[in-house]
């Protein structure tokens, strides 16, 4: 069963807030902006992560210099799963943050 519009927005809002909290607490040198439902994380070296919601598809999208990734929410696991690779959002973020900032962050709760 597809996510309702309200549930989808609640999930994306909660995910973006959790990401903001995690990055705030990380001590990394970065800037964040959350505007109109789009969360942008800018790393010291200029790399960016952009998280946006795609309401018609009920997907969370992540843009990174390595590409664009589309995530569906899996109700059974309570996790966002990449549409193509089936990698969890948290796993992908751990790898990307390591590559961009040289730091290991724990995204298990994302």
Swiss-Prot record:
InterPro entries: CyaY, Frataxin/CyaY, Frataxin/CyaY_sf, Frataxin_CS. It comes from the Bacteria. GO terms for biological process: iron-sulfur cluster assembly. Transmembrane segments: none annotated. One of its GO terms (cellular component) is cytosol. The keyword Iron applies. Keywords: Iron, Metal-binding. Involved in iron-sulfur (Fe-S) cluster assembly. May act as a regulator of Fe-S biogenesis. This is Iron-sulfur cluster assembly protein CyaY.
